[in-house]
Curated annotation (Swiss-Prot):
It comes from the Eukaryota. Keywords: Chromatin regulator, Chromosome, Cytoplasm, DNA-binding, Metal-binding, Methyltransferase, Nucleus, Repressor, S-adenosyl-L-methionine, Transcription, Transcription regulation, Transferase, Zinc, Zinc-finger. A zinc finger (GATA-type) spans 458-488. Pfam families: ADD_DNMT3, DNA_methylase, DNM3A_N, DNMT3_ADD_GATA1-like, PWWP. Required for genome-wide de novo methylation and is essential for development. DNA methylation is coordinated with methylation of histones. It modifies DNA in a non-processive manner and also methylates non-CpG sites. Acts as a transcriptional corepressor for ZNF238. Can actively repress transcription through the recruitment of HDAC activity. Also has weak auto-methylation activity on some Cys residue in absence of DNA. InterPro entries: ADD, ADD_DNMT3A, C5_DNA_meth_AS, C5_MeTfrase, DNM3A_N, DNMT3_ADD_GATA1-like, DNMT3_ADD_PHD, PWWP_dom. Belongs to the class I-like SAM-binding methyltransferase superfamily. C5-methyltransferase family. One of its GO terms (biological process) is response to fibroblast growth factor. This is DNA (cytosine-5)-methyltransferase 3A. Residues 599-877 form the SAM-dependent MTase C5-type domain. It comes from Gallus gallus (Chicken). A zinc finger (PHD-type) spans 499-555. Residues 447-579 form the ADD domain. S-adenosyl-L-methionine binds at D606, G607, I608, A609, T610, E629, D651, V652, R653, R856, S857, W858.
Length: 877
């Protein structure tokens, strides 16, 4: 029973549970914090014999507990007596007090967790309830509370991805909800607690409060309090809900959960992603003005500023074709985001008919192109409105990943050789690369400007301090990662004829293209502003035409200093890029003139018989020329131009050891397997071990069959050719099989066209400098017919595609005739490659068919350069 005393009204109010009757068992603390008397009726007797009314305490009263055990029973903030619990009779009634009760009251005012109820079982004090006078902490707003406990901030750096299984996600969610409920109870205690001034100084008890109950007043840290039952229940539920389901990203900047966006990270193109809740990442909440983004393609998470995000509807401005052509992960990301976008917009793309001969990756590529065209057209007919996430996807706890982000066809993208990896490490890559902070490069360059560091000690491409060699073009260092990127991308060109990536870092999305028609280099805005100086990129944009830092008259531009000997350094860079060491090839001494015999040649993937043409030009007698070729047009050209001296044997896969023994022995084996599935320019490439890439192993097989047996010391030579723009891993594998490192030769030194190629072989002097002859046509004008004017001194690499004839960023035709632009004629292309005029003019072939033959052929001056030493070994005319 709770009685009123005549104590002053400013004392603390304390709830008391009356003692049970002798017949009743003592109250036991229940697991949920309720105090229950099993069937017993609690009674209290006043001196006047008045019996109090039965009922519950008023809801606006807040009571303190002095009893330690009862305090533990009330640890969860609930006190729920049974119906037999008596309530105070009348707040105005005064009960007599004795000194013993006064001593009990003083102890209650200083009560802590330590138990005192056993000593004062039958001496309960009744204090006047003053709940209406109490002040609720946090009632004016939690921001003004003295007990603010800001959440610890955990910064997040993009790194290893989080692949969340359903089981693990459920475990995390359950754990976070338990933590939120626990925190909610603490907040409820702190929000509803009543401040009660102390009546007189009291002696503090040596006890500590329970972990779940926070001190309410700095002056009295040991007073353990609990909220009034009904209020605590309501606050518990509300606070738990607010802590667990508090809305995210409510900063008025848009881009809520579930929206499809483009995000920009330094060193990467704009990448598609999806805004997700913080709990999905397993990290802390994103700060105001930032969003958690889950990237398509690799499933990683990053915190990105709102300023670095664009809606997916900005597809035409954010989509980067060069990155799409090069990086398989980017293609996969585009495929996935457009799958989700088409699903939301209700756009259905017709399925491509599949049969046994249709490659799944080609089907995916066709569908992807259809979706990209739809996206570039503005996501019609629904437009950007149709890309908004449905209501269920805005729920942060909705499991949309397994249902919405399925990628059955995306897996058909066979992972080709690793492309440029701009300063970021992923677990999918075979090597773990160094993660460089966004500001590392800027900080190091600043130190160079302050003369605190040597620029040769840092990688000017990415900012790494793990320098392994010098940059071949500019003063500065280069790390191993950027070296591999440079090897892959230095000779990769877009459809406009310019390099696909920055000359310095082999990255960047926004690049400046040189205005010199004979230069094809690009520089990204980031490198220009960082190394040349702030604002240099804008100044270059305003300058028209702008000559880049490789062809400009000056050699120094801020910290960007061009090496004077860069041509030879670039040559040595590709000549000495070998991470594998092999024994030098066997050197054969020259054969005396009287002992020289005609050469016997096995040409695999022969094309239009460039090898035989060069041997004839050099005057070397050819005894036998066996060629493996499957293209009918190429066979026709070879048969007509060489009067049937070539023996065609069909598909290389059908040539056996028996055939080699029958046709041999051979003195020279040459070939260049198709590069379609090796070149990183091809977005659908399959690599060395699939598609046409596997044909390299046919060359390797027949090369070993044709080698001289042990004891046969006759000179034996071989040559294998392929593109420079191949993956580092593919080049490494080819070198490992051939037990030789390649040399890189660019035909621009001896012809009017760029054409960089790798050559493996044991021909003498393959590493010697490439020198032009008097008969080589080094300028495009020398290759043109009368009355035609060349607009460029050299053309870019001519391929099998018709648009490879166009030059420059504006796609100009290379020739000017009759005051009009014109393409190269077939006879002019033949001169560019070094072939005789009308060499491919057989069988009424069209212009495009002739260009396809030339686009797959070798450059005649380059092969002449490689074959020239053979005159010391074989008979000549």
């Amino acid at each position: 029973m709770v009685e009123s005393s005549d104590t002053p009204k400013d004392t603390a109010a304390v709830p008391k549970c009356p003692p049970p009757c002798p017949e009743a068992s003592p109250a036991e603390p229940l697991p949920n914090g309720d105090l229950e008397a099993d069937g017993a009726q609690w009674k209290g007797t006043e001196e006047g014999g008045a019996s109090p009314k039965s009922g519950r305490p008023e809801e606006d009263e807040t009571e303190s507990l002095a009893d330690g055990e009862t305090g533990r029973a009330l640890e969860n903030g609930r006190c729920t007596p049974k119906e037999g619990l008596d309530a105070p009779a009348d707040e105005g009634e005064l009960a007599p007090s004795d000194p013993q009760k006064k001593r009990g009251r003083r102890k209650l005012l200083e009560a802590t967790e330590k138990s005192k109820e056993e000593k004062e079982e039958n001496n309960f004090d009744s204090l006047k309830m003053e709940g209406s006078r109490g002040r609720l902490r946090g009632g004016l707003g939690w921001e003004s509370s003295l007990r603010q406990r800001p959440m610890q901030r955990h910064t997040f750096q993009a790194g290893d991805p989080y692949y969340i299984s359903k089981r693990k996600r459920d475990e995390w969610l359950a754990r976070w909800k338990r933590e939120a409920e626990k925190k909610a109870k603490v907040i409820a205690v702190m929000n509803v607690v009543e401040e009660t001034p102390r009546a007189e100084p009291q002696k503090e008890e040596e006890a500590s409060p329970p972990a779940s109950q926070q001190p309410t007043d700095p002056a009295s840290p040991n007073v353990a309090t609990t909220p009034e039952p009904v209020v605590a229940d309501a606050v518990d539920k509300n606070t738990s809900k607010s802590a667990d389901d508090e809305p995210e990203y409510e900063d008025g900047r848009g881009l809520g959960i579930g929206e499809l966006v483009w995000g920009k990270l330094r060193g990467f193109s704009w990448w598609p992603g999806r805004i997700v809740s913080w709990w999905m990442t397993g990290r802390s909440r994103a700060a105001e003005g930032t969003r958690w983004v889950m990237w398509f393609g690799d499933g990683k998470f990053s915190v990105v500023c709102v300023e670095k995000l664009l809606p997916l509807s900005s597809f035409s401005s954010a989509f980067h074709q060069a990155t799409y052509n090069k990086q398989p992960m980017y293609r996969k990301a585009i495929y996935e985001v457009l799958q989700v976008a088409s699903s939301r917009a209700g756009k259905i793309f017709p399925a491509c008919p599949e049969n046994d001969e249709t490659d799944t990756s080609k089907v995916v590529e066709i569908q992807n192109k259809q979706m990209i065209e739809w996206a570039l057209g503005g996501f019609q007919p629904s437009g950007p409105k149709g890309l908004e996430p449905p209501e269920e996807e805005r729920n942060p706890y909705k499991e949309v990943y397994t249902e919405m982000w399925v990628e059955p066809e995306a897996a058909a993208y066979a992972p080709p050789p690793p492309a440029k990896k701009p300063r970021k490490s992923t677990t999918e890559k075979p090597k773990v690369k160094e993660i460089i902070d966004e500001r590392t490069r800027e900080r190091l360059v600043y130190e160079v400007r302050q003369k605190c560091r040597n620029i040769e000690d840092i990688c000017i491409s990415c900012g790494s301090l793990n320098v392994t060699l010098e940059h071949p073009l500019f003063i500065g260092g280069m790390c191993q990662n950027c070296k591999n990127c440079f090897l892959e991308c230095a000779y990769q060109y877009d459809d406009d004829g310019y390099q696909s990536y920055c000359t310095i870092c082999c990255g960047g999305r926004e690049v400046l293209m040189c205005g010199n028609n004979n230069c094809c280099r690009c520089f990204c805005v980031e490198c220009v502003d960082l190394l040349v100086g702030p604002g240099a990129a804008q100044a270059a944009i305003k300058e028209d035409p702008w000559n880049c830092y490789m062809c400009g008259h000056k050699g120094v531009y801020g910290l960007l200093r061009r090496r004077e000997d860069w041509p030879s350094r670039l040559q040595m860079f590709f000549a000495n890029n070998h991470d594998q060491e092999f024994d030098p090839p066997k050197v054969y001494p020259p054969v005396p003139a009287e002992k020289r015999k005609p050469i016997r040649v096995l040409s695999l993937f022969d094309g239009i018989a460039t090898g035989l043409l060069v041997l004839k030009d050099l005057g070397i007698q050819v005894d036998r020329y066996i060629a493996s070729e499957v293209c009918e047009d190429s066979i026709t050209v070879g048969m007509v131009r060489h009067q049937g001296k070539i023996m065609y044997v069909g598909d290389v896969r059908n040539v056996t050891q028996k055939h080699i023994q029958e046709w041999g022995p051979f003195d020279l084996v040459i070939g260049g397997s198709p590069c379609n599935d090796l070149s990183i320019v091809n977005p659908a490439r399959k690599g060395l071990y699939e598609g046409t890439g596997r044909l390299f192993f046919e060359f390797y097989r027949l090369l070993h069959e044709a080698r001289p047996k042990e004891g046969d010391d006759r000179p034996f030579f071989w040559l294998f050719e392929n593109v420079v723009a191949m993956g580092v891993s593919d080049k490494r594998d080819i070198s490992r099989f051939l037990e030789s490192n390649p040399v890189m030769i660019d035909a621009k030194e001896v012809s009017a066209a760029h054409r960089a190629r790798y050559f493996w072989g044991n021909l003498p002097g393959m590493n010697r400098p490439l020198a032009s002859t008097v008969n080589d046509k080094l300028e495009l004008q020398e290759c043109l017919e009368h009355g035609r004017i060349a607009k460029f001194s050299k053309v870019r690499t001519i391929t099998t595609r018709s648009n490879s004839i166009k030059q420059g960023k504006d796609q100009h035709f290379p020739v000017f005739m009759n005051e009009k632009e014109d393409i190269l004629w077939c006879t002019e292309m033949e001169r560019v490659f070094g072939f005789p005029v009308h060499y491919t003019d057989v069988s009424n072939m069209s212009r495009l068919a002739r260009q396809r033959l030339l686009g797959r052929s070798w450059s005649v001056p380059v092969i002449r350069h490689l074959f020239a030493p053979l005159k010391e070994y074989f008979a000549c005319v």
